[in-house]
Amino acid sequence: MIVDVRNAAASAVAFLFVPLLAFAGAAEGEKKAAPCVACHGEAGNSVNPQWPSLAQQPAQFISTALFMFREGNRKNDLMTPMAKPLSNADMNDLAAYFSAQKAAQPKHQSKPENVAAGPGLAKKFNCSQCHGPRLLGQQHIPRLAGQQHEYVLAQLKAFKAQTRADIDGNMTSAAQALSPQDIEALADYVAGLSAE
């Protein structure tokens, strides 16, 4: 077997320094996150049911969402002007910071019938296929567990109405099968889940 020493050395250096870069990005992101706190809460834990929590969201999801707001692919009267001046480095720093924050325990109390029906609905509509088995998100796909109820409800309705864009079209497609009752039950269910 031939081993390319240069590639092995480069891999070792990357393995050692990538965590340091993420830490540096999180430190820079904390400085840049001051304006975000007004809506998204201290350390990214929103207390307003209409605005999403960013804490413990996958970094790639956060940076992708900011990019989509900046480029006009995703629209929001508050977020679009906030994202417009951000550089790619700013977005990555903010993403590193918020993804490193611990999500608060949800305050939302899901209805017992939705707690019972939620896992079956999540399986039926393939939520866990993309969002992960515990709905904690991965890569460019957001954490749903413990997210604000009203926010999730509004996003699911927007995907169904095709007024919200997503990067690969999967959510727009998946939402078409949801009834209004399914949307309410799923939003209520995921809002009560722990992000731990």
Give residue spans per PLM region:
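Bacterial N-terminal signal peptides that target proteins for export
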Residues: 2-12
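N-terminal signal peptide c-region/cleavage motif recognized by signal peptidases
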Residues: 19-24
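Sequence/structural segment immediately N-terminal to covalent heme-attachment motifs in c-type
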Residues: 25-43, 106, 110-133, 148
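Gly/Gly-Pro-rich "capping" loops immediately C-terminal to redox-active cysteine motifs
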Residues: 44-74, 80-86, 119, 123, ...
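C-terminal capping alpha-helices of c-type cytochrome domains
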Residues: 84-106, 150, 176-196
